[in-house]
C-alpha cells in the first residue's frame, strides 16, 4: 500500500466525509422506498374507497327509498375517504359519488334527477357532480385544518363527519335553486309545499331526509374514520398531505 493510500484510509477527515456520503446515500434510498411504498399504499386505499362508493351506489346500501323520499348514505364513504386520504382523496371520492349520481340521472335510477336531466342535461351534470366533488374536497380540508390543531384534534373526526352530509345538502340544494328554481318542474314542488321563497323551499324539500343523513353519517363515518386512521398509522408524508 502506498503512503498516499495509507494516508487516505487513516485520515479522520476523509473517513468522516466518506461515512457521511454513504449514510446520505442510504437515507436517500430509504426515503425513496418509503415514498414509493406510501404512494402505492395510498393508491390502493383510494381504489378501495372508490370501489365501496360504487358498490353502495348500485345496491340498497347507498340509497334507501321510502315513500316520498330517498335517503343517501354515500356521504359516509366520502367522509371517511376525505379524512383518511386527505383533501385530494376526498375530492376523488366526492367526484365518484357525483358520477354515480349522474348515472342515476341519465338512466332513470333517480326519478327526480332524471326529470331534471330531460329539462337541461348540462345543468344536471353540474348539479350532480360539482357539489359532490366540492363536498369531498372541503371535508378533507376541514379535517386537515382541525387535525393540525392539538387542542381540537380529537374532535376533528366528528366535525368533519358532520360537515360532509351538511355540505352535501347545502351545496346540492344551492346549485339546484340556482339552476332550476324557476323551472315549472321545481315550481310544482314549491306549490306543493306551499312556500313562497327559495329558502323555505330548501327547508321543506330537505326536511327529515337531511336530518337522517346527517345523523347517520356523523355517527358511522366518525367511528370508522377514527379507527382506520389509527390502524393505518398516517404519520408520514404522502399525497394525503
Residue spans for each PLM region:
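Internal alpha-helical transmembrane segments of multi-pass membrane proteins
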Residues: 147-170
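Juxtamembrane non-transmembrane "cap" segments at the membrane-aqueous interface
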Residues: 169-192
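Hydrophobic transmembrane alpha-helices
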Residues: 24-93
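Individual transmembrane alpha-helices with interfacial aromatic-anchor signatures
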Residues: 123, 127, 195-216
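Membrane-interfacial segments
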Residues: 60, 64, 68, 108, ...
Amino acid at each position: 500500500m502506498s503512503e498516499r493510500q495509507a494516508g487516505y484510509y487513516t485520515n479522520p477527515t476523509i473517513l468522516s466525509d466518506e461515512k457521511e456520503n454513504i449514510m446520505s446515500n442510504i437515507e436517500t434510498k430509504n426515503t425513496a422506498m418509503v415514498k414509493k411504498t406510501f404512494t402505492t399504499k395510498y393508491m390502493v386505499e383510494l381504489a378501495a374507497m372508490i370501489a365501496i362508493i360504487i358498490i353502495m351506489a348500485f345496491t340498497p346500501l347507498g340509497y334507501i327509498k321510502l315513500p316520498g323520499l330517498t335517503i343517501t348514505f354515500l356521504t359516509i364513504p366520502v367522509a371517511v375517504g376525505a379524512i383518511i386520504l386527505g383533501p385530494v382523496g376526498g375530492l376523488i371520492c366526492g367526484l365518484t359519488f357525483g358520477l354515480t349520481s349522474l348515472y342515476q340521472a341519465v338512466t332513470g335510477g333517480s326519478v327526480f334527477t332524471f326529470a331534471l336531466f330531460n329539462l337541461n342535461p348540462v345543468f344536471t351534470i353540474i348539479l350532480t357532480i360539482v357539489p359532490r366533488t366540492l363536498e369531498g374536497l372541503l371535508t378533507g380540508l376541514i379535517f386537515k385544518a382541525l387535525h393540525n390543531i392539538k387542542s381540537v384534534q380529537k374532535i376533528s373526526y366528528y366535525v368533519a363527519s358532520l360537515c360532509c352530509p351538511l355540505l352535501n345538502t347545502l351545496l346540492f340544494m344551492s346549485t339546484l335553486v340556482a339552476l332550476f328554481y324557476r323551472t315549472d318542474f321545481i315550481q310544482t314542488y314549491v306549490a306543493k309545499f306551499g312556500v313562497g321563497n327559495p329558502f323555505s323551499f330548501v327547508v321543506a324539500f330537505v326536511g327529515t331526509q337531511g336530518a337522517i343523513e346527517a345523523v347517520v353519517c356523523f355517527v358511522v363515518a366518525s367511528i370508522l374514520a377514527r379507527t382506520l386512521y389509527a390502524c393505518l398509522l398516517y404519520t408520514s408524508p404522502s399525497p394525503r398531505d
